[in-house]
UniProtKB/Swiss-Prot annotation:
It is an enzyme of class 2 (transferase). Belongs to the protein kinase superfamily. Ser/Thr protein kinase family. Poxviruses subfamily. It comes from Vaccinia virus (strain Ankara) (VACV). It holds the Pfam family Pkinase. Essential serine/threonine-protein kinase that plays different role in the viral life cycle. Phosphorylates the host small ribosomal protein RACK1 thereby customizing the ribosomes to a state optimal for viral mRNAs (which contain poly-A leaders) but not for host mRNAs. Facilitates viral DNA replication by inhibiting host BANF1, a cellular host defense responsive to foreign DNA. Phosphorylates host BANF1 on serine and threonine residues; this leads to BANF1 relocalization to the cytoplasm, loss of dimerization and impaired DNA binding activity. The gene is OPG187. ATP binds at residues 22-30, 45. This is B1 kinase. Its EC number is 2.7.11.1. It is found in: Virion; Host cytoplasm. Its cofactor is Mg(2+).
């Protein structure tokens, strides 16, 4: 359905005139609105992923909470957007859910493609640190992102040095009342996320925990440096079991993973991925240590 021209009424009774379609993905379509600062994200209510996003926005992404966390951690920027409003729209046969969210600029995937599918190491390390800061905030609220990738990292419209991790349709609550979710497989959750970057735990049907997001970020940084992961082409065939098995082969052999992917082994990624692979499912990472490792790649 094309929503352009429709007038949507949100939960606060404000009206939004839907403009042209500017993006479409696995978790909804994105349209401009009559206010250039915002876009509207729409999908059928039955799909459920926008409800997951809406719940995450309302429970976790409160501006006051983010600001307080930034001050307490001495971190200048957390790349998470907030939700302006939400609501439902009913057509003749289908009911739709919509969110009104901040309008951003180009995504990182477009930037990488415009640079011959390769970014300088310094840029990759800086992006890695930004995403690390962002997922640390999420993790300390008890949530994992579950789908970190270049197309879900978006530049600010004005300040191109600010990045945002978007698309919260696969967020998972791995902590509840101070207790970590148990290490129990759910066959219905197997292989969630983007196959090339899905963490091994998710392949097996476990809820993505902190180590899963960090693992995915490691795979992404290899790709942003221009590398081709050993399972990249297999991912295109949608053979989930073979992708999972191939990833498992490299868990204890990070140097080989890097040499196979990049033809060299950057010290920072060698240390980063090795440390990720040493984490247990329940373990809280030492984010400062991960930041320090990546920061070495910024200056050396």
């Amino acid at each position: 359905m094309n929503f352009q021209g429709l007038v949507l009424t949100d939960n606060c009774k404000n009206q939004w005139v839907v403009g042209p379609l500017i993006g479409k993905g696995g978790f909804g379509s994105i349209y401009t609105t009559n206010d250039n600062n915002y876009v509207v994200k729409i999908e059928p209510k039955a799909n459920g992923s926008l409800f997951t996003e809406q719940a995450f926005y309302t429970r976790v992404l409160k501006p006051s909470v983010i600001e307080e966390w930034k001050k307490s951690h001495n971190i200048k920027h957390v790349g998470l957007i907030t939700c302006k409003a939400f609501g439902l729209y009913k057509s003749i046969n289908v009911e739709y859910r919509f969110l009104v969210i901040n309008r951003l600029g180009a995504d990182l995937d477009a930037v990488i493609r415009a640079n011959n599918n390769r970014l300088p190491k310094r840029s990759v390390m800086l992006i890695g640190i930004e995403i690390l800061n962002t997922i640390q905030f999420m993790h300390e609220q008890g949530y994992s992102h579950g789908d970190i990738k270049a197309s879900n990292i978006v530049l600010d419209q004005i300040d191109k040095n600010k990045l945002y991790l978007v698309d919260y349709g696969l967020v998972s609550k791995f902590m509840s009342n101070g207790e970590h979710v148990p290490f129990i497989r759910n066959p219905n959750k197997m292989d969630n996320g983007t196959l090339e970057f899905t963490p091994i735990d998710s392949h097996k049907g476990y809820v993505v925990s902190r180590r899963g997001d960090l693992e995915t970020l490691g795979y992404c940084m290899i790709r942003w440096l221009g590398g081709i992961l050993p399972w990249t082409k297999i991912s295109e065939t949608k053979n989930c079991a073979l992708v999972s098995a191939t990833k498992q082969k490299y868990v204890n052999n990070t140097a080989t993973l890097l040499m196979t992917s990049l033809q060299y082994a950057p010290r920072e990624l060698l240390q980063y991925i090795t440390m990720v692979n040493s984490l247990t499912y329940f373990e809280e990472p030492n984010y400062d240590k991960f930041r320090h490792i990546l920061m070495q790649g910024v200056y050396y």
